[in-house]
Amino acid sequence: RVAGGEVHRILADAGIGQDEPHVFADPKLYAEWSFVEELDGVLAATDAVPVAVGSGVINDLTKLCSHHNGRRYMVVGTAASMDGYTAYGASITKDGNKQTFDCPAPLGMVLDPSISAAAPARMSASGYADLIAKIPAGADWMLSDAVGSEPMDDFAFGLVQDGLKEALSDPAGVHAGNVEKVEQLAEGLLLSGFAMQATQSSRPASGAEHQFSHLWDMEHLKYNGASVSHGFKVGIGTLASTAFLEMLLDAPVEQLD
């Protein structure tokens, strides 16, 4: 419900008619197919333009269901928790497996840094982990380009990489909810989404570290009985990926056959 009331007020003040907001009742809301079916039913009963108010799960559910119902949507982000706000595709668990479904990015996106800074620290930590993963992901892309596998896109690469140092400069400030630092984090995440949108590929924003997350998705990884956020899984993958890159740099590759 964070920011939902304010969005309702702003639209009402602008004279825009609104349906009754749909709020998922399940406190353990997850990007899972049963919730897709629930929201599909809601949207099928109206011709209203969907406005997602929330973070990753709400955005992915609304993105896919809007596509199912033949319309575009906008999103009001409430946390700097992941890079998918501005990218195509929705990650949804169906038949026990996490899958990426093809669907367009939102037509519009709004994020108030003061609201995101007030989100639980674990959500910003998840976003920070997702963003720091862009460093080894960028290295992976450079290696892939060097061996002729996946050509670099200089525009998309720069969109992701150029602002990383500043966006990642103060993890303590992000954890403490410093508005300026959370805003920098959010900007980095949104730019990553734009890069994926520009290339219609996740290549600019993900590398080997994301494969760990995909594996754990398929294994239904939980911690203390709860699902683990995408960012945290990617963060652990980043540790493994960077360790491998360090080993690669130390390896006498010129001696390899």
Predicted regions and their residues:
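Short glycine-/acidic-enriched loop or helix-start segments at secondary-structure transitions
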Residues: 4-6, 61-63, 85-86, 120
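General beta-strand structural signal in soluble alpha/beta enzymes
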Residues: 20-23, 51-53, 74-76, 110-111, ...
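A short, small-residue-rich loop immediately preceding and capping a beta-strand
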Residues: 43-65, 69-78
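ATP/NTP phosphate-donor binding region
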Residues: 1-49
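Solvent-exposed alpha-helices and their adjacent loops that cap or buttress functional pockets
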Residues: 42-45, 66, 99-104, 108, ...
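Active-site segments that bind and position negatively charged phosphate/pyrophosphate groups
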Residues: 159-257
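A glycine/threonine-rich phosphate-anchoring loop and its flanking beta-alpha core
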Residues: 67-166
